[in-house]
From Swiss-Prot:
It catalyses: 2-formamido-N(1)-(5-O-phospho-beta-D-ribosyl)acetamidine + ATP = 5-amino-1-(5-phospho-beta-D-ribosyl)imidazole + ADP + phosphate + H(+). Disulfide bonds: none annotated. It comes from the Bacteria. This is Phosphoribosylformylglycinamidine cyclo-ligase. Signal peptide: none annotated. HAMAP family: AIRS (MF_00741). Its EC number is 6.3.3.1. Its main location: cytoplasm. InterPro entries: PurM-like_C_dom (IPR010918), PurM-like_C_sf (IPR036676), PurM-like_N (IPR016188), PurM-like_N_sf (IPR036921), PurM_cligase (IPR004733). The gene is purM. GO terms for cellular component: cytosol. GO terms for molecular function: ATP binding; phosphoribosylamine-glycine ligase activity; phosphoribosylformylglycinamidine cyclo-ligase activity.
Amino acid sequence: MDYKKAGVDIEAGYKAVELMKKHIQGTMRSEVLTGIGGFSGAFSLTSFKDMEEPTLVSGTDGVGTKLKLAFILDKHDTIGIDCVAMCVNDIACAGGEPLFFLDYIACGKNEPEKIATIVSGVAEGCKQSNAALIGGETAEMPGFYPVEEYDLAGFAVGIVDRKKLITGDKLKHGDVLIGIASSGIHSNGYSLVRKVFRMEKEALNTYYESLSGTLGEVLLTPTKIYVKALNSLKTGNVEVKACSHITGGGFYENIPRMLREGVTAIVKKDSYVIPPIFHMLQKDGSIEEQMMYNTYNMGIGMMIAVDKADADKAVSLLSVAGETAYIVGEIQDGEKGICLC
């Protein structure tokens, strides 16, 4: 008996590392001090001397059961983008600049080519957010995961000058809410998605005119990364007073998280375009509207609050940055929470 017969192929692990190196190297920043394959990753902070109080911000998350679609369709090149997005978008909500990222892949069987493909998506997400992929772990766990399945999670660290932390404390009556469009369902609520739609390859490969693509393509569309969009507001001297990444819990759970006590968010449902996939999901699943807004982003992946005088400028800057943004409501005095009308 040996380790390989027990289900763990060390040589496959070495091969996977070699295959993923080219993807990782494309994410490197000058501040990275260590190479691939060490016990830890090191990142220098000396280039941030202009900050009065350099403050680290962090985020960790996974992709969740969206992975099941990747398994069914045998498509693994974009799921890593979702993993990065779920972490760096949270950092961006605090005003942070992502610095580096680490991934964790646990699988039933280490297939080097598949692992490298997954990491290529992680690397793409890192490039989109200007974060260095400085480390990771691939754990082969036979008997724990089915041989064709894996789990994917990650951890990101960013930096912000403490005085520029986005906390919501400056919110006042009359501030404007701007919603930045999502790319689709993103990475939450897929347990419900999988109950509504038939999770078979034939069904997922069915083309729908209303979706302008197959169901599988639309459901696997990567989570949008908003780092560069929010950076465009910084460079354009627009102060973001509050920011919310609309993930699990939808509008009702996430928007209140960006508010201080004593203010409420008034959001108008008819102020923006809801993507067709949400209408299809709601109809086919007979899901109540409130449940939809309490589960999904409903077409708004990031919500920000700015001063009324900056609202039009913010929308314009976001447009130049390649985003679709809508003025969707305002902040009013009242009990902390959200009014969807």
